[in-house]
Structure formats: structure tokens, C-alpha cells
UniProtKB/Swiss-Prot annotation:
Signal peptide: none annotated. GO terms for cellular component: nucleolus; nucleoplasm. It comes from Dictyostelium discoideum. GO terms for molecular function: calcium ion binding. Disulfide bonds: none annotated. Residues 10-45, 46-81, 85-120, 123-158 form the EF-hand domain. It comes from the Eukaryota. Ca(2+) 2 binds at residues 59, 61, 63, 65, 70. Interacts with numA/nucleomorphin in the presence of Ca(2+). Pfam families: EF-hand_5, EF-hand_8. This is Calcium-binding protein 4a. Keywords: Calcium, Metal-binding, Repeat.
Length: 162
């Protein structure tokens, strides 16, 4: 499991590498021109738009440059957006089991989902039991989107821990 300290160290290293790659004048920041050149070098489709957007969003002190902390913020936001997108896709894919569309998966819906996914009845029961043991955190015999999301965050270690 990745700790917050390790995650932030990795983020800092990635930030330093990005700045190092684009910083032409050695001030440990990326100016608008340096950002543009970096994105152009990386063959971004519209480096002007990307540069202007990043500066607008993450140049917190509005000095026309991105500092290490501002770049870390940008990378962290990008990571969170990607993680949340993946989480939503994961939850949505599992919630195909919600046959009555009430935003809850019952044990029987889970079992039926596994059967229609190719498991035999015995396997489907085992899979449904396992799913409910792992995911139904409030033991109400239903799995909600939030329970599934929280399970995925923990199981796949999406966000770093203490």
C-alpha cells in the first residue's frame, strides 16, 4: 500500500522532472513560453490552449509562471479526476447487475448477474456471497453505489493512506 508520504514524494519527483524538462532559464518555474515549448515538444494537439488553460487554472499567484507547488497541484488534480473517472466506470459496470434500477444490488441480482456473465449457478452463489461479504458494509443485504465505490478505493488502493 502506498503511503501519503510516498505518494507525495513521487508527486514531487514527477513535478521536479516536469519543471526540469521545460525550465530553460533555471528559475525552477515554468513560464508561459516554457510551458508552450514543453507541450509543443510533447506533441500536444493544441499547446497554446493547454498552456493558457494550465496557467489560468493553476497559476495561483498569477505571476505568469508555474512553480513546483502549482505544478504539483495540477498533477494531483489530474490524478484525482482520472481516479474518479475510473471509479465511476467501475461502479457503473458492476451496477449493470441492478436489474430493477433502484440503485441497489440485492444478493439475487448479483447472483443473476454472475449467471448471465457465464458462471454456473453454484459459482454464481459463491461469487455473490463473496461480493456481499466484502462490499455490503452496513449488512443491509443490498450494495449501494457508495459502498461499491468505497470498497474499490480501499481494495485497489486508489488514494494513498496515512
Amino acid at each position: 500500500m502506498v503511503t501519503k508520504k510516498e505518494f507525495l514524494e513521487d508527486l514531487t519527483n514527477a513535478t521536479n522532472e516536469m519543471i526540469k524538462a521545460g525550465d530553460k532559464n533555471g528559475d525552477n518555474q515554468l513560464s508561459k513560453k516554457e510551458l508552450y515549448e514543453l507541450f509543443k515538444k510533447c506533441k500536444y494537439p493544441n499547446p497554446t490552449l493547454v498552456t493558457n488553460s494550465l496557467l489560468e487554472l493553476f497559476d495561483l499567484d498569477k505571476d505568469g509562471k508555474l512553480s513546483v507547488n502549482e505544478v504539483k497541484t495540477a498533477l494531483l488534480v489530474d490524478y484525482i479526476i482520472e481516479a474518479e473517472t475510473c471509479l465511476k466506470k467501475f461502479v457503473d459496470s458492476i451496477f449493470k447487475a441492478d436489474s430493477n434500477k433502484d440503485n441497489k444490488i440485492t444478493w439475487d441480482e448479483a447472483r443473476q448477474f454472475f449467471v448471465t456473465s457465464g458462471s454456473n449457478e453454484a459459482q454464481a452463489k459463491v461469487f455473490a456471497n463473496s461480493m456481499f461479504e466484502d462490499v455490503d458494509s452496513d449488512d443491509d443485504k443490498c450494495i449501494t453505489r457508495e459502498e461499491l465505490r468505497e470498497y474499490a478505493i480501499e481494495y485497489y488502493e486508489i488514494y494513498p493512506t496515512e
